[in-house]
Regions:
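Mid-to-C-terminal "cap/lid" subdomains and adjacent gly/pro-rich loops that border
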Residues: 147, 161-231, 372, 421, ...
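Active-site/ligand-binding neighborhood in enzyme catalytic cores
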Residues: 217-385, 389-394, 400-404, 414, ...
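Mid-domain catalytic core of redox enzymes
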Residues: 379, 384-503, 507-510
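Conserved flavin/dinucleotide-binding core of flavoenzymes
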Residues: 3-49, 81, 393, 413, ...
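Glycine-rich active-site loop/strand segments that organize a redox cofactor
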Residues: 5-15, 97-136, 157, 220-231, ...
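N-terminal glycine-rich phosphate/pyrophosphate-binding loop and immediately adjacent elements
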Residues: 53-221
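Mobile amphipathic helical/loop "lid" adjacent to a hydrophobic cofactor/ligand pocket
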Residues: 2-13, 24, 140, 144-146, ...
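Short, solvent-exposed loop/turn segments at secondary-structure junctions
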Residues: 69-70, 93-94, 106, 122, ...
Length: 648
């Protein structure tokens, strides 16, 4: 398993007859599958006509730092509410943050296959008997709102690939006389992986995960749920995933000890296999030493279920639908500086829609409204300091023309509320915080985001000839290895595009760090040669893949050295889970005093996913609406909004 491996049982459990206790009569309660903490249906609040609330103080001045998906969502939902004095500041010359969709042919005017260098597979939290856009998630809501096209993601080990090749220990797993690549064909979605060793690992993983899913689904959002989740957290918050894998399995779950589901009971040899290639669908090694609550949240609560590839705001031919500024020569911020114009292809289309698509409530887009103001949207502007003033406003200092040091100018502006969406290491290393008292910003909060663990990640993408997926029957569509390249994905967006794509290497943490010294060109060459070597060494393959790959057009992304990110996903180590939760509590406990709102994946416990970005943005909007006495829609009040729980 990788961070985005498929585990679909949470989407099927309610359909397959699991007992589900009725949730409370609260219309804002979420349903399973969904994240475990608040059991709050954010979609129900956001999808209302006129949005979350109606502003009674529309001139309340709001600054949003970062134009990734979190910042863009916050800007759109605040504008829907009627707030009109919004300033969005972005350090780079593009929007989207770690939604980084790179055109495979940057100078082509024809629609073509993109490379998703950041997030690439999206859970919609839909159940098995409903389409993705009916999932009770904000991803489902925005995909429906913006008419995004999508398809099932071609995950290793899933039914959405023709076959998955598994190459471990130089092809010796399986006990053949010659090196072999094990071939996993899973057309029905329930076929176990090949080989006795892998099947033992698969059985132990599935027994643990299925049992936990059944019991969680039964009690989720019921009156007993909060106590059960607290018991689960108490049992596992200090346990690493490595230790969970080897922890003895339970014979049966005991309702008198509801948080204890035991472990997977794997032997050292089985754990080594699971570390290297999961159940044949990708390595979990990069996450072995993080708090086990992270992979449990990912698998059990729907983040791994029915994952989707976002094609963009496109028609069946893969061409963009009529959309704002699609044919503009350039787009400009409030100062007249240009930034990357929208293409509406790939996941970036989501971010582009958040900024450029008109809102029903206002008749114009966030972009159009921002352009009417001298400070509505500022790109190429790096925030350097936040200073609390005696009048309770926050002064935001930023360097304009950040990318041109010889022309950089320092500016500042004063705001009533400031939403910070940046990766936390950027906050620590780039932004000075001044005059914030302990009642506003406790040292415990600062320590929690300073000591957060940011994962490294490296992706190597390249164009792939159409003939590989159309005619090749020998080389598996997805390949999982214990080599330095690790996982290989190939997939198609559209028949009409001139080429497909190959994710030639996808690595995390130590596996990504060990590739850091190679130049992009060296790394691409090494990955192609290594994949050829593996395929030629496997007696049942004996064919190179490099003739299908556009090596010279390959693109490499290393997130830890990206100056706009300093990491790919924020995780947490054993014993630090409550530090991470405290960051999610900050907006409710301190923001009304400090004027600061922390939002997004950086301040969540579900690393590497887009849904917590949406929810963090909406959380900030809820609290700003509450602070400014906005009128909530749909009868919602803060008493309907659950609290995050720390240790009792």
């Amino acid at each position: 398993m990788t961070i985005g491996s498929s585990y679909n049982y949470p989407a099927y459990v309610t359909r397959d007859g699991a007992r589900i206790k009725r949730s409370t009569t609260n219309k804002w309660a979420a349903r399973f599958p969904n994240p475990p903490d608040l059991c709050f249906d954010y979609r129900a609040l956001v999808e209302q006509e006129n949005g979350i609330a109606r502003a009674t103080d529309p001139s309340h001045r709001i600054c949003i730092i970062g134009a990734g998906v979190t910042g863009l969502t916050a800007a759109r939902e605040l504008y829907r509410c009627g707030f009109t004095h919004i300033t969005l500041i972005e350090q780079s010359t593009r929007i989207g943050g770690r939604h980084l969709t790179v055109p495979g042919s940057p100078h082509s005017t024809q629609s073509h296959t993109p490379f998703e260098m950041g997030a690439m597979r999206m859970p919609f939290f839909n159940r098995a008997d409903e389409p993705p856009t009916e999932g009770r998630s904000l991803m489902a809501y925005y995909a429906k709102t913006f008419d995004l096209a999508f398809s099932d993601f071609a995950n290793p080990g899933s039914q959405w690939v023709h076959s998955t090749g598994i190459y471990l220990r130089e092809g010796s797993m399986g006990g053949g006389a010659t090196p072999q690549m094990l071939i996993w064909k899973n057309a029905d979605g329930s076929t176990p992986p090949p080989g006795k060793e892998l099947q033992r690992v698969y059985a132990k993983w599935k027994a643990f995960a299925d049992r936990m899913t059944r019991h969680v689904a039964e009690l989720y959002a019921s009156q007993e749920w909060e106590a059960m989740w607290a018991a689960i957290v108490k049992k596992y918050e200090s346990v690493s995933f490595r230790d969970l894998v080897s922890m003895p399995a339970l014979e049966a779950w005991d309702k008198h000890s509801p948080g204890d589901f035991g472990g997977m009971g794997m032997s050292a040899e089985e754990s080594a296999i699971f570390y290297a290639i999961g159940i044949g669908d990708g390595s979990w090694g990069a996450f072995y030493d993080v708090c086990c609550l992270y992979p449990l949240r990912t698998a059990i609560f729907g983040f791994s279920s029915q994952l989707q590839l976002i094609h963009g705001r496109v028609d069946t031919n893969g061409d963009p639908l009529t959309s704002p500024h699609l044919h503009s020569e350039a787009v400009f911020d409030s100062t007249g500086r240009s930034f990357d114009k929208p293409r509406y292809i790939g996941l970036a289309a989501l971010d582009e829609c958040l900024l450029f698509m008109n809102l029903d409530e206002t008749g114009k887009s966030v972009y159009d409204h921002s352009r009417e103001r001298s400070n509505g949207l500022l790109t190429d502007s790096s925030v350097t300091k936040l200073k609390k003033l005696s009048n309770q406003k926050t002064r935001v200092y930023f360097n304009w023309k950040h990318s041109q040091p010889e022309q950089t100018q320092e500016h500042f502006d004063d705001f009533d509320s400031v939403i910070v969406t940046l990766p936390s290491w950027l906050i620590e290393t780039r932004i000075t915080l001044e005059n914030f008292t302990q009642e506003m910003l406790p040292f415990e909060t600062i320590n929690a985001y300073k000591t957060a663990h940011w994962e490294t990640s490296c992706k190597v993408y390249a164009p792939l000839k159409k003939s590989f997926l159309s005619k090749n029957t020998n080389i598996p569509q997805a390949i999982v290895t214990d080599s330095f390249i690790h996982d290989v994905y190939t997939y198609r967006y559209n028949e009409n595009y001139s080429y497909d794509c190959i994710l030639l290497s996808y690595t995390w943490e130590d596996d990504a760090t060990k590739l850091a010294s190679f130049s992009d060109k060296e790394l691409v060459s090494k990955c192609a040669k290594e994949l050829d070597r593996i395929l030629m060494n496997a007696a049942n393959i004996r064919e190179k893949i490099s003739p299908y790959i556009g090596i010279d057009q390959a693109v490499v992304q290393r997130w830890i050295t990206d100056k706009n990110a300093l990491g790919c996903a924020k995780l947490y180590r054993p014993g630090t889970y409550f530090d991470a939760v405290s960051l999610m509590k900050y907006n409710r406990d301190f923001a009304h005093v400090s004027g600061l709102y922390f939002s997004g994946e950086s301040f969540s416990v579900d690393a590497g996913w887009t849904e917590p970005c949406f929810r963090g943005a909406v959380d900030a909007v809820i609290h700003i609406c509450n602070k400014t006495a906005a009128t909530f829609n749909g009868g919602f009040s803060m008493s309907d909004y659950p609290h995050y729980q720390l240790k009792a």
